[in-house]
Structure formats: C-alpha cells, structure tokens
C-alpha cells in the first residue's frame, strides 16, 4: 500500500501495520461491501496459511460505525463476535474446540461458521476465514438462476434454515449467558439498539401515519413495556440466546451453485456481533419480515416459499406462539426504514403499514380471524401444531 493509499484509508494502513509481523501479514487489503458496523476487508496473504488459505477476511471495529456517520457504538461488539464464533453458540459438540469451528449435519443440511484465526483485542480486529464461492440468500433469490429454481427447492431451503434456527434456540433455552459465553450478557449496547429498533421505531411511526396507526399507539406502548419487563427479568416466554441479526441480505450464505447440487445444502452463518438474549419469537419475526420485504418490494416469489419452509422447519408453534410471532413480524415491518422511503408510491407504503398494523393488533388481541385475512394467515396456520 503506497503513501497515497495509506492516507486515503488510514484504517487499512493501521491493519496492515498490525498484521505485518504475524502469520496473517497481508500484501493488500480491499474493502468488502456491506459493513455498517465494522470496517471489513479481504486481505491477500503474503504467505499461504498452513490450511492453504491465501486470503482472509479482516473485521475491524472503531468507536463509530463504518457505514453511519455520526453514530457511535462500543468496540465491545467485536469481542462478542469473536467469542461467539469461537465457542459460544456451539449447538452441537461436533468438532474439536481447538479448531475454532463448528458445524452440524441436520436433515441433509450442514451449518457452519467462519473459522476465527485470530482476535486482536488491543486493536479490536478479527481475522476470519474467507468463505469463497458463497452468496447471500438475497443474492440467490435475485439472481437469474432462481428463475429456473422450483418452489420446492426454495421451500426446502427455508425448512432447513428453520430447523437450524430452532435447534439454536432450543440449545440456548434455559442456559445462562455464562454457560454459553462469558460476554453475551454484557452486550448491552446491542440489546439497547435492537430494543429501540423493534419497539421504539413503531411508536414513532404513529406520528408519521396518524390516520393509520393512531388507534394502536396504546397497544404499541404496551408491547414495548412488556418487552422491557421481560428483558429486565429474563423470564419471558421462550426467552434465550439468539443470533440477533439473521438477515437474508447479509448473514446467511449458501453455495453459489446450490441449485445444481441441492441434495446436500450447506449454510454458513456470519455476523454474530448482535448475539444477545431475547425472545425467540422476535428473531422468527425478524426472519419472516426480512424475507417478506423481498416479496413486497421486489416481487420475488421465492421469498414466500422460503417463509413457508421456515415455519415448517422451525419447531411446531402453538396458537399463542403464532400470535407472538405475528406481533414481532408486524413490529419489524413497521420499524423498517422502507416506511420512510420515497422510492415507492404513497399507497404502496400505506398498504404495507396497514399489513404491519393488522399483524400487530391480531397478535396482541389473539384475533385469529384478522390474522387469517393477512398474507401470512395461510402459512401461519399451516405451521401450527
């Protein structure tokens, strides 16, 4: 890296200097798109590692976010991610802890996480395995190859993702943070940020859409207050360890050639910085809402097939669990920044807000009839045990 390059990217220069005397010394770093919280680079190693790797992923944390100007966040998030990847969420004791890698075979699906080569606590830098040949679920759904993909395949993909996430939740249920990883309980900033997103944003949307949300402000506030009590006492229904950031556009990777060899599907789950203790149904609502955005605003039918499969693969939900999940799904949709977008017709945004409102109210009041009339009614009740 020359003088000009160092001046234009001082973070990369710092990383190169820190790694220069280690086995992870890099000849170059190239910025990887998609990082809002961290500075993410792909490093070309000066010498291959013993496992043959010639590149690594470098995640570096600062007290400010890389993609959001003016917003600060503790670098403790990098500690959470490193510990979680190395030890924490090992749902299954399958490989030696010395490899710093865990994976599991479940119904012809294998789930893995990147190997943590090194964590430099002093500089808040993680050196991770570079997962090559993989794409995000969102990239898969928006690619041309999806046009020739059957709904059965995308449903199976969702089923396997639901099975894995259900296994993660079941493993963490009833375990204290200390039993999983020593630091998850202290990830207070992540908890505060996600709490404000899920419960603060929907209340603020009332001011934006008073004609649509005015009558449900009290319900939104009651949901927020209940969540605050549950988070404080950690005694809410299905309250336990969650990944915290399962999004189709960033956290769930599948092989780029999955369509041609889908008999044995492999997931790689990344971005564990927001791991925390929360309601399992909230994480399910986030997964469903994130996928539905692809259907609603990009008209990607495969997203609904994944939703159906996810609910079929996740451990059976009773009626109360369906209602709780509907609440969190509606909250996620209301909280999402798309409600602030000017890129879509006003009526399209308002119809979206109405759907989110109906999901929240139907879930809160346990109104089966209203829930059944939404686009999620059929898939919810099909998944009910």
UniProtKB/Swiss-Prot annotation:
**EC number, as in UniProt:** 2.7.1.-
**Catalytic center at which residues?**
245
Which pathway does it take part in? Secondary metabolite biosynthesis
User: Keywords of this protein's UniProt record, alphabetized?
Assistant: ATP-binding, Kinase, Magnesium, Nucleotide-binding, Transferase
EC class: transferase
Q: Which domain of life is it from?
A: Eukaryota
Residues that coordinate or bind ATP = 38, 59
> Where does the signal peptide begin and end?
none
Q: Which reaction does it catalyse?
A: (1S,3S,6S,7S,8S,9S)-6-[(4-methoxyphenyl)methyl]-3-(methylamino)-5-azatricyclo[6.3.1.0(1,5)]dodecane-7,9-diol + ATP = (-)-FR901483 + ADP + 2 H(+)
- Which SUPFAM superfamilies does the protein's record reference? Protein kinase-like (PK-like) (SSF56112)
Output the InterPro entries linked to this UniProt entry: Kinase-like_dom_sf
Similarity comment text for this entry: Belongs to the methylthioribose kinase family.
Task performed by this protein: Phosphotransferase; part of the gene cluster that mediates the biosynthesis of the alkaloid (-)-FR901483, a potent immunosuppressant that shows efficacy in animal models and a probable inhibitor of purine nucleotide biosynthesis by targeting phosphoribosylpyrophosphate amidotransferase (PPAT). FrzJ catalyzes the last step of the pathway by phosphorylating the C4'-OH of dephospho-(-)-FR901483 to produce (-)-FR901483. The biosynthesis of (-)-FR901483 starts with the condensation of two L-tyrosines to yield (S,S)-dityrosyl-piperazine.
Instruction: Give the record's subunit note.
Output: Monomer.
Q: What protein is this chain from?
A: Phosphotransferase FrzJ
**Origin species:** Cladobotryum sp
